[in-house]
Amino acid sequence: MYRMKKTKIVATMSDFRCTEEFVKNLYDAGMDVVRVNSAHVTEDGATHIVETVHRVNPAIPIMIDTKGPEIRVTTIADEYGNSINFRVGDRVAVRGSDGSDMTTRKVVYMNVPTIVRDIPVGARMLIADGELEIRVVEKTDEELICEFVVGGAMRSRKSVNVPAVSIDLPSVTEKDRRFIEWAVKNDVDFIAHSFVRSAKDIKAVQEILDAHGSKIKIISKIENQEGLDNIDEIIEASYGIMVARGDLGVELPAEAIPNTQRRIVEKCICAKRPVIIATQMLYSMVKSPRPTRAEVSDVASAIYERVDAVMLSDETAMGDYPVESVETMARVAREIERDETHFKPMIDIDTKTGRTGRYLAAFRGRKTVMAVCYQLHAQRILALSYGVVPILRNQELHDKYHFLVDALEFLDQYRKLKGEDLLAIVGGSFGPDGGASYVEIANVDNIRRRNEEIVAAQKC
């Protein structure tokens, strides 16, 4: 059933809570896309999620996040228990490792063998999302001598951010490669690649997809300063962009995030790329049945910016109120959009790629785009685009007259059309892929009468 909401909702799902009833409840509440985070699930667990979702509705698209290239502290040595406490002013050596060396009070090992080479004196290193901070005060060929600026408990495998410094990391890790190949085999629609720094990272993922003949679309997650510095080339090389405000907020001052988000959204809309806003949008609803006013305003601000989608993470993956979180987000979207929900649909046909529907969405028109698709993949990828309602037709029509008659009948299943309703119809070439080739604007009665007469004449 058509749900009057232009802004789409991406909901993260975990394998420990993924029954058919749960998926259906989230979908009925307003979820449009299911996200799976490969950092927190095995391949078997991810397969269970995909199979369950597609049993509920094969039209629900699946997005999987890669873990991406990242820097982490190695495991804390056994003699220190679970953590090592450091105070402001303490000094430690930082060395690169293949991951086998244990971190001690004197030497902090990080899982990038070449890290000493890449980091200069004066650089800041943020550990555990900024809970601890060290600054490089000296450097030798073998190690960095660092001083704690912010102390605290250092635990095993905590993340490390180095703002404004380019680290030589692989574009695709071995785990990423395995999950990308798994995604190809398991009917996934989007890959959200983490910690994208340049177009080179996207091309590395695309090469794997091309080698398998896959149509999976790449969403680039912007999570660090290097990604921001190269945002234009990243947008150009990507299908879409996710503004991942968690890690981005570690590297940038908190007050810089809103303007950064707005600039990325504007660039994506101009480039006709879907854009998703993510991280802690309704985070209090992990434990509370109601969001804070600030969270509602955050969601509303993203919707006012006309983003394609807003995303829920822990709220639906592990929170106590997953369905309520989706319902809340959907209600906010409908409230913000309610002055623009008059159903005067624009019909788009794209038999292969969904490209025309995505381009129409980029204009952020006041009217809903009804996208008639003849392939399930096109229907799924358009489910992420702003204001687009993708409809699957099993029978491909070979001329515009049959298409228009069929489309009007099909639209009546979603919302009754009045004879005086004005429609804009964008259609393709009904042959070799040539993209959209015509636009027609007329009221329902005129379209129906004219094209039914032509179809009847063709049968004679």
What kind of feature is each model-predicted range?
Residues M1-C460:
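Non-catalytic helical/linker scaffolds that mediate oligomerization, partner binding
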